[in-house]
Each structure stands twice: as structure tokens, then as C-alpha cells.
Amino acid sequence: MTTVQTSVYEPLTEPKAVALAVRLGLFRDGTPLACREIGDGNLNLVFHIVDQETKQGVIIKQALPYAKVVGESWPLTLKRAVIESNALRTFASYVPQYVPKVYYSDESLAITVMEDLSRLQIARKGLIEGKTYPLLSQHIGEFVAKTAFYTSDFGMNQQEKKKLAQSFVNPELCKITEDLVFTDPFFDHETNNFEDELRPDVEALWRDDRLHLEAAKLKRKFLTEADVLLHGDLHTGSIFVSADETKVIDPEFAFYGPIGFDLGQFFANLLLNALSRSELERQPLFDHIDRTWDVFASVFSNLWRTESVETYAATPGLLEDVLRHAFIDAVGFAGCEVIRRTIGLAHVADLDGIEHKDERLVAKRHALRLGRRLIIERRVFTGTEDFRRLFAETEQ
């Protein structure tokens, strides 16, 4: 990968994106190129440039200095583009099969040029359409296990880990998560967004001191536990997938945090899809949760036993303690994400796309009950089968 620092920042347009691709030598001179801006997120411009003869393409992603969902009144650091390209490169050193190739990045322009993944589909969209993606959970379990282990104090020299962690200090993007996932939904905050019919349910959460105490504990973990290099935003909209291939994208929220956070985000987004499904249709989603954890625990444990650099690694009970805390935290983090995606800023199409309003409100009330109990009762979970139990208990 090439990283450079060139001109002063300016947002790209489609013609400028094409000119950049040609200047970088990614296409031959005179090649007929098609370009379109395909970004559907809140923070970036994304250009898809394709050779109209060979159909080969590249993606040019540029960070915006503000959140599109809010506008220029919400400024954002452009450093997140560097965080993203560095995270993709770091992840590629451990799991190259699960991330796009990075061809070029420019710090000043906040640009990353990467592999075209248009042969794949965004997992959220496919899951909403009813696709099941049999290998998705196996791949994500391995992705999280290997990136977590190899960037932890167990998998790398502790001093080298501290140096790596310094390069992923990401306060601006972490602040978004601190606010939108762990704080705002639990209080009457202007960023919250929900239907008027949900107000009694939401106000009950705002008055729930028991819930607030447990959410505060989870927020503290997010703020203070620098265990592993996290993707930081591992939802189903950050994953490209097919029947046999998985690619994790958009790690601009990457930072050193608690080992269970990425797992919790992924679990939550599977649950959000399950909330929009019939009982029979939910089963593959619960199976994905089971498989993700099983693969994560198996791969992480094998690496621990064969490659750990920690002197205490052979101490009986330590691995089990690490995995137990990771699982409990993942359950709680999942609860925060379920609530946030239901009543906070930046909803998900899994719920908002439910066509009939009455059914949508039923699903969202279910989401709030489920999220609350995931947070409060996380310590009583003994395995992923408890997701099924709690899901059924909170369905009314």
C-alpha cells in the first residue's frame, strides 16, 4: 500500500475521482471509464470506477469533514481516513481473506483507494431479503478471533502493542459511539429519533435507574479497557458477503477497546434482523450467533494455547476467565446497540423497513424490552442459547 500526503483537502466529484484513478495508474490511458458515487453512509463519499471494457473496478473512499446525517454543524476529523487505511492494513496481516485490498491512500485528501467488492452484497441488505449466507458467522468468528488475539497482550509483545495502540487513538470517532450507543438513548437527548407512539416505552427507559447503572458500567468498559484493536463498528452494513466470501469494510471507528465489543455489535445486528422475522425465519440468525461465538472461542483458544506470549497463559482458568468476560460484555454491548438502533440516531433498515406501522411498532417495542434485559441480565447468560430464551421471553 502507498500512503502519501499531497494537496489541500477538497471533496471529490465524479470527474475528479476518475482523474485521480488515471493519475495513479490504476487504469490504462484512454480506457473508457464509468464512475458513480455510491456512498449510502453518513460520513463519507464513495466512488465506484469501472473499466467499461474489462469490467474491472476500484473504490475510492473519501472522508467528509462532517456527518452527512446532520450536516456541517457536526464537524468530524479527517484523521479517520488514516485510521481506516491503517486498520485495513493491520487486519490484512492477520486475515487478508476477510478485508479488501488497499491500493493507495492520501492523508491530506482523506482518501483510501481499495479493492472493488461489487461482486458481493452488503450483508444487511441480503439478510433483509431473506438470504442466509451459511459461512458468514464462521468468517466473522475467525476475523474477530484472529484480529483480537494478535493485537492483544496475549498475541504480541506488550510494548509493541502499546505502540500500535498509540497509532489508533481515535477520540472523535469514539466520542460518537460513547454518545450515540452508551449515553443519548438512555436520556431525553436531541439526537434521539423515534415514533410518537413509542414515547411511553422510551420514557420508561429514561427513568430506569437499574438500566442506567448497567449501561454506565458498559460505557466505562468501552472508555477504559484497551484490550484489542477493534473494528469499532462491526454491524451488518459493514460487511460485504456472498455464499462463500466475506469482506469486512469501514473500520474508521477502529481503536483499542474491550474484547467483546465487536462481537456485541455483530450479535445485535443479527438480533435486529430477527426482530423483523417470523419465528421460523429467525432460526438461521440465531444459528449465526451460535456459530460466531463458537468459532471465535475455538480459534482464540487455539491461538492462546499455541502462540501466546503471555507468561501467565498456561495458568489454569485464565483463558476461561478472558472468554467469560468477553462473552458477558458482548451480551451487554449487544443490548446497548439494539436500543440505540431503535430509538437513537442512525436506525437500521431491518426495523424501519417493516412496511406496516403496527407491525413495526410491535417489533420496536420488542427491541426495547430485549435490549434492556440483555444489558441488565448479561451476567446470567451461560451461552448463546440464552439469546433465544430472552428473545422469546421479551416477545409479547
Curated annotation (Swiss-Prot):
Cited function: Catalyzes the phosphorylation of methylthioribose into methylthioribose-1-phosphate.
Catalyzed chemical reaction(s): 5-(methylsulfanyl)-D-ribose + ATP = 5-(methylsulfanyl)-alpha-D-ribose 1-phosphate + ADP + H(+)
HAMAP family (UniProt xref): Salvage_MtnK
Binding site for substrate: 233, 340
Top-level class of the enzyme under EC nomenclature: transferase
Stored Gene3D superfamilies: 3.90.1200.10, Phosphorylase Kinase, domain 1
Family: Belongs to the methylthioribose kinase family.
Alphabetized GO MF terms: ATP binding; S-methyl-5-thioribose kinase activity
The organism's place on the tree of life at top rank: Bacteria
Full protein name: Methylthioribose kinase
Key words of the record: Amino-acid biosynthesis, ATP-binding, Kinase, Methionine biosynthesis, Nucleotide-binding, Transferase
GO biological process annotation, one example: L-methionine salvage from methylthioadenosine
Source taxonomy: Bacteria, Bacillati, Bacillota, Bacilli, Bacillales
Binding locations of ATP: 44, 61, 115-117, 250-252
Oligomeric form and interacting partners: Homodimer.
Pathways per UniProt: Amino-acid biosynthesis; L-methionine biosynthesis via salvage pathway; S-methyl-5-thio-alpha-D-ribose 1-phosphate from S-methyl-5'-thioadenosine (hydrolase route): step 2/2
